[in-house]
Amino acid sequence: MSTILESLPTGQKVGIAFSGGLDTSAALHWMKLKGAVPYAYTANLGQPDEDDYDAIPKRAIEYGAAGARLIDCRAQLVAEGIAALQSGAFHITTAGVTYFNTTPIGRAVTGTMLVAAMKEDGVNIWGDGSTYKGNDIERFYRYGLLVNPDLKIYKPWLDQTFIDELGGRAEMSEFMNQAGFAYKMSAEKAYSTDSNLLGATHEAKDLESLESGIKIVNPIMGVAFWRDDVKIAAEEVTVRFEAGQPVALNGVEFKDPVELLLEANRIGGRHGLGMSDQIENRIIEAKSRGIYEAPGLALLYIAYERLVTGIHNEDTIEQYRENGRRLGRLLYQGRWFDPQAIMLRETAQRWVARAITGEVKIELRRGNDYSILSTKSPNLTYQPERLSMEKVASTFSPRDRIGQLTMRNLDITDTRDKLRVYSQVGLLTPGESSALPQIKGDDGK
């Protein structure tokens, strides 16, 4: 039997990831009318644009759910977000501005915790609102089957009968109104938004055009820093880490990581910190474009990276960055709990993050404009006296450096010989304006 069901399994329990929005509301009621036994599961991910989580399961029952549960995913979401930060699991950047993989982290948490809750209720069929062209359909597929190997997947948006009857938002709104729910369709935005406590994603519709910029977006986690009428005062912020964990902001210690990240969001959001415009490759290798927000993670990342560069040596930092980029791709692909991802993540958490103890003071201005004002750590290997040009006790002398430079003659000679070979076979033909050396053979040719 196929894992993916193309038609509604009537008479059986079907779990649906229920947001309370028009799409999942219409799908739930439609499944009920068609003979399935729908169960609704809502993840509390601390979405900044959701103000009443408790009302969502009640609406699901009203629309026909046989059962509805609200699953608090915030603690796990923040734990996975900090793990991603510790391992630098961010592979999408443009000119040094980073996307913090906030949606992939949210999917890892939602996909595992909701399916675990369904399994407790004896629900082994799962549906959600992801479309066949996106990343989430594969992410949820992988995470769901990891938790429940007996899981079957039913997605109304892959069921042709559902599509024929309720193929668009107007049809869904009319369907709900005719059912007596007086469902008022929200005003259409120029883009779609998905969010959690870690960050927000804005994409699709008008944002599919690269002629539309960030200015059409109304931020939900911070301010529109590009607007002249938005006044933003410079602000100094201190961030403290202990053994890789963020523990304090502006001298205030937080026992609860969720509360710390909420405060980091408020601080960064006042400046529009962490917003980025990215073109990326989806899992299926088609390119897409998104506008992202992550004010809190961006603030923590600035401080964390500063301490990484001050504490670890060059080879460790290089390995951390290479592994982080690879891990970021695995996270994006829905492989956050795969063995290769766990290996990369735990390596960074053990050998990089564990040494990260210290405090960084940052001045935030507008958007991603900031300055680092001070860096303190008992683990710093940055020792300016080693390189001071003043008369100080030194770890090495001028004579030591002469010897070190003399040893470089070996590889310089090898490099010169190799360039000569390349020149002789026509691989190097520098013009007059080239910075490449004019390599000649022993005969002067």
From Swiss-Prot:
InterPro entries xref list: Arg_succ_synth_type2_subfam, Arginosuc_syn_C, Arginosuc_syn_N, Arginosuc_synth, Arginosuc_synth_CS, Arginosuc_synth_type_1_subfam, AS_cat/multimer_dom_body, AS_multimer_C_tail
Pfam families, per database record: Arginosuc_syn_C, Arginosuc_synth
Catalytic activity: L-citrulline + L-aspartate + ATP = 2-(N(omega)-L-arginino)succinate + AMP + diphosphate + H(+)
Binding site for L-aspartate: 131, 135-136
Pathway field: Amino-acid biosynthesis; L-arginine biosynthesis; L-arginine from L-ornithine and carbamoyl phosphate: step 2/3
Keywords in alphabetical order: Amino-acid biosynthesis, Arginine biosynthesis, ATP-binding, Cytoplasm, Ligase, Nucleotide-binding
Binding site for L-citrulline: 99, 135, 139, 192, 201, 203, 280
Enzyme Commission (EC) number: 6.3.4.5
GO biological process entries: argininosuccinate metabolic process; L-arginine biosynthetic process; urea cycle
CDD domains hit by this protein: ASS
UniProt record similarity statement: Belongs to the argininosuccinate synthase family. Type 2 subfamily.
Protein name as it appears in the record: Argininosuccinate synthase
Native source organism of the sequence: Burkholderia ambifaria (strain MC40-6)
Protein encoded by which gene: argG
